[in-house]
Amino acid sequence: MEDFNFGRELRLLTPSHYSRIFNEPARAATPFFTLLAKPNDQDQPRLGLTVAKKRVKKACQRNRIKRLARECFRLNKHNIDNIDIVLMVKSGIDEQSNEELTKQLTKLWRKINERCKPGAPKPPPFKKRPNKSVKSNKQT
């Protein structure tokens, strides 16, 4: 019988766990989620969540999204290889229904799992966005 728990060993806990994934990750995205992932040396997948107050203003909505993501991961972890995943949310997610978010997450678990397999093409590096607060001194 499958083990459907979501214990401490299935979570990313320390800043070093997160920073390892941010260095050349495999990426997958939908309109409301971005997943970053890297293979790990554990015997199970692990999940880290980042739901920024800047993206989702109300605490009850941030908590709803985190509960939903943990539950969806817990039910799908047996289909995911040994990879570490960081889930980030985008603006506008708090207006979506639970069913829509679950559908997107289920699709993303499959997509990121394929992109982390050995032999999968490496993604291009992140492109740094220009800082919006710096004003251009360009003269016309």
Swiss-Prot record:
Q: Would you indicate the residue range of the signal peptide?
A: none
PROSITE patterns membership: RIBONUCLEASE_P
Alphabetized, the UniProt keywords read: Endonuclease, Hydrolase, Nuclease, RNA-binding, tRNA processing
EC number(s) from the headed UniProt entry: 3.1.26.5
User: Which Gene3D superfamilies is this protein grouped with?
Assistant: 3.30.230.10
Lipid metabolism as a keyword of this entry, yes or no, is no
Record-linked InterPro entries: Ribosomal_Su5_D2-typ_SF, Ribsml_uS5_D2-typ_fold_subgr, RNase_P, RNase_P_CS
MF GO annotations:
3'-tRNA processing endoribonuclease activity; ribonuclease P activity; tRNA binding
Pfam family name, one: Ribonuclease_P
Q: Which GO terms describe its biological process?
A: tRNA 5'-leader removal
Q: Which cysteines are joined by disulfide bonds?
A: none
- From the UniProt entry, list the residue stretches annotated as the region Disordered: 115-140
Per its database record, what is this protein's job?
RNaseP catalyzes the removal of the 5'-leader sequence from pre-tRNA to produce the mature 5'-terminus. It can also cleave other RNA substrates such as 4.5S RNA. The protein component plays an auxiliary but essential role in vivo by binding to the 5'-leader sequence and broadening the substrate specificity of the ribozyme.
Subunit field text: Consists of a catalytic RNA component (M1 or rnpB) and a protein subunit.
Q: Which PANTHER family match?
A: RIBONUCLEASE P PROTEIN COMPONENT
Family note? Belongs to the RnpA family.
Designated name of the protein: Ribonuclease P protein component
What organism, scientifically named, is this protein from?
Pseudoalteromonas translucida (strain TAC 125)
Q: Which gene encodes it?
A: rnpA
